[in-house]
Amino acid sequence: MLSPTNSISKTVPAPPQDSSKPVLISEEPQNQLLQKVARTALAVLLVVVTLGLILLFYSFSDLQSFPWCCQTRPSTKEHPTISIPEPLPSPPLAVPRPSTPPPPVISRPSTPPAPTPAISPPSTPSAPKPSTPPPLPPKAPKPVKTQEDLLPFVPEQVFVEMYEDMARRQIIEALVPAWDSDIIFKCLCYFHTLYQGLIPLETFPPATIFNFKQKIISILEDKKAVLRGEPIKGSLPICCSEENYRRHLQGTTLLPVFMWYHPTPKTLSDTMQTMKQLAIKGSVGASHWLLVIVDIQARRLVYFDSLYNYVMSPEDMKKDLQSFAQQLDQVYPACDSQKFSVKIAAKEVIQKGSGSSCGAWCCQFLHWYLRDPFTDALNDLPVDSVERHENLASFVRACEAAVQDLPELFWPEAKALF
C-alpha cells in the first residue's frame, strides 16, 4: 500500500506525431556549412590571383631560381633535418703525403670530448697500392696563341732604321745609274786618251769568273808575239783592226779586265745564257761587275770587288790569284825575274745602299789607280754612304760628258812607238 502523503507522479503521454510531414534541418547548421564553403572558395581565389600576379612579373627562368621552387636533385645521403650544401672538392694530389697527420675525428657527444693525441707520421712514406693508384692532377688548359703572339716583337727603332735605309737607297739609286758594257767600254776608251799605257779591252762579250784567266794569258801571249814581230794567235777584237790592235798590244802596260758575274750559273755557257736573258728583260738582276787589273810594268794583280766578298771571300780569292800569278810568271817572265804580286783592294763593302753602281765603282777605282797606283784611295772614302755616292755621281757625270764625243764602240787609234 502506498502512503497517502506521497504524491503520485503521473506520466503525461506525448502527443502523437503526424507521419505525413517531412523532418526539416535546423537553420543554424545550414549557415555554418555555407560559411565554410565561402571561405574555401575565397582562399582558392586569392591563391589563383596571387599566382597570376607572380606569373605576370617573373619569367619562368626567374621562377626556377626562387628558393621555394621545387627542383629534384639526387642525394646520396639522407639528412634528418636540414641539407647543408657540400663544399667544392679540392684537386687531388698526385702523390700522397704521409708526413702530414690525418685530421682528428670530431665526435659530437653530450659532454665535451677529451683532446685527441696527435699521431706521429711514419718515418718512411708508404707506397701507394697498385690496385688504387693516386689520381692524376687535372691538366692545365693550353694557352691559346693569337696572331699577335705568333708574330715576333719588333722594336720601334728597327722600323725607324728600315725607313731611313729605304730613303737612303732611293737617294743613292737616283744619284748613280747602272752602267752597262757599252758605257764601260767608252769609259776605257776615254781613259786611253789620258793614259796611253792602258788598252781598252772590249767588254762584250765580257770576261767571266770561268774564263778571265785564259783571256789574260791570251792577251799576254799576243803581246809577246807582237814584240817578236810574229802574227798574233788570239782572236781579234770586233771593233778594232789588226794593225791598230797590234799597236795597242805593243805599247800597253796595263790590262783592265772587267768581269761579269752572276751567282746562279755554274758554267761559262750558263753564264752567257743568263746574261742574254737579263739583257732581253732590261734588268741587271743579281749580276755584278768585277775588275782585275794586270799591271805588267809593276808586276801586280789587283782585284777590286765593290761588294767585298760577292764572288768568294777575299782570302780565297787571294789564294786563287796567287796561284794564277805563278802561272803568269811562266807565261810572261820579267827581264829582272820579278814575280807578280797580288793585292785585294777592297777592305769593306764600298757600294753601301746601292745595288747597281758596281760598274761605275770599277771605273772610279781604275781611274784612281791610273793616277797613282801606289796610293790607296779607298782609305779616303767618306763614311756616309750618301756622301760617298755623291762623289761617285760627280765622277759619272764627268765621264758621261767626256765620252759623248767618242765614236760609237770603236777602238781609239793607238800611236806607234817606233
Curated annotation (Swiss-Prot):
Per the record, which residues fall in region Disordered?
Answer: 1-23, 75-145
Name the active site residues: H288, D305, C358
| Highest taxon of the lineage | Bacteria
Say what the protein does. Effector proteins function to alter host cell physiology and promote bacterial survival in host tissues. This protease possesses deubiquitinating and deneddylating activities.
Query: Which keywords does the record carry?
Result: Hydrolase, Membrane, Protease, Secreted, Thiol protease, Transmembrane, Transmembrane helix, Ubl conjugation pathway, Virulence
Name of protein? Deubiquitinase and deneddylase Dub1
Query: Which parts of the chain span the membrane according to its record?
Result: 40-60
Biased region (Polar residues) positions are: 1-10
In terms of InterPro entries, this protein maps to:
Papain-like_cys_pep_sf, Peptidase_C48_C
Recorded family membership: Belongs to the peptidase C48 family.
> What EC identifiers does the entry list?
3.4.22.-
- Gene Ontology biological process terms, A to Z: protein deneddylation; protein deubiquitination; proteolysis
Question: Which GO cellular component terms are attached?
Answer: extracellular region; host cell; membrane
Pfam families, per the entry: Peptidase_C48
